[in-house]
Amino acid sequence: QVVANDFWLLFSCSVGAFLMRGAGCTWNDILDRKIDGAVERTRSRPIPSGQVTLTQAIVWMMVQIALAGLILLSYNFNSIILGLSSLFLVVIYPFAKRFTWWPQVFLGLAFNWGILLLFVAHTGSLNWPIIALYFAGIFWTLFYDTIYAYQDSQDDLIIGVKSTAILFGAHAKKWLLSFILFCFVLMAVSVFVRSEEHTSELQ
């Protein structure tokens, strides 16, 4: 049965995800301001182009985090802890391209955290179907962000930034096919396991 709390969770998680994505992107732009200034596609971004000062960017990031935090405090204890723990992934992601060829994995871990958070906010705990769905989201992120990274691969090579696009090179197609395959398999597993659980609950 759908209740008012379900609508609140759907609405608030959507707003919270929007705010935290904005905060994460701002944090990424703050740390990458010198890199962005050296890349053709990104040198016109607000910070490297001088449209926004570093102080303004930091204040804007903190405002977004504060608003998302207020939403998080309306949830149960487990989801508050889960939400706070996501900050580690948000903080570390911009550094990932500096020490690993797989920064897209860190992006996937961070971007799809909301799947876990919404479920825990609704039920109070995790289960295997939702964990499978979370990993499906990670593979989906690996798929699309690897494609996205190819447009900067030449500049990234020059300045020493790592990515799966550079790592895969001419072998990208088989990797991308693998990612999308794993994504669909994990989504199917999630649906199947949950349907089996639901059937057993009705018996």
Segments the model singles out, each with a brief description of its role:
Residues 7-17, 33-83, 158-196:
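Multi-pass membrane catalytic core of lipid/isoprenoid biosynthesis enzymes
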Residues 15, 23, 42-132:
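Intramembrane alpha-helical segments
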Residues 197-203:
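Conserved small/polar residues in nucleotide/adenosyl-binding loops
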Residues 2-9, 80-86, 90, 104-159, ...:
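Functional transmembrane core segments of multi-pass inner-membrane proteins
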Residues 30, 34, 150, 154, ...:
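Calcium-binding loop positions in Ca2+-binding modules
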Residues 24-28, 36, 40, 144, ...:
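Alpha-helical transmembrane segments and their lipid-water interface positions
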